[in-house]
Amino acid sequence: MSIGIALATIAGGFLFPFAIRMMWGKMVDEWGAIGGWMAAAFIVGTVWTINHGIPKSMIYQSGTVWVDMAVAAGIGVFTASLLTGGKFSKSVVNLAAAVVGGVLGGFLLSLFL
């Protein structure tokens, strides 16, 4: 993997949590619940397309194992929350649920992929 591909992959991983932190809450504040649905469609869809869905995508897949964009979003938003004064102890239950859900989802995908 070249330096350019590595930097593009890092930037692609940064892009998703950054877009979530910058836009999702504002869309919900402006348009209510429908803003959350619109954010889910526009932010996730656009960033997925940039990272994976075009021929020269930002994220380089080097093998058969893949990491979902949710990992980047979770780590990025979690870190940003801690840096802005969030408490780690309040997030333990959510982190545990996310890990269990990720393992379960990965297992289910492994059954047919």
From Swiss-Prot:
Its subcellular locations are: Membrane
- Indicate the transmembrane segments per the record: 3-23, 30-50, 63-83, 92-112
Domain of life of the source:
Bacteria
Entry GO terms, CC: membrane
Describe its membrane topology.
Multi-pass membrane protein
For the keyword Transmembrane helix, the answer is yes
**What keywords does the record list, in alphabetical order?**
Glycerol metabolism, Membrane, Transmembrane, Transmembrane helix, Transport
Q: Name one GO biological process term.
A: glycerol metabolic process
Q: Does the keyword Coiled coil apply?
A: no
Q: What is its main location?
A: membrane
The recorded induction information for this protein reads:
Repressed by GolR.
What function does the entry list? Answer: Could be involved in the glycerol uptake either via facilitated diffusion or active transport.
- Put simply, this protein is called Putative glycerol transporter Lin0367
- Lineage start: Bacteria, Bacillati, Bacillota, Bacilli, Bacillales
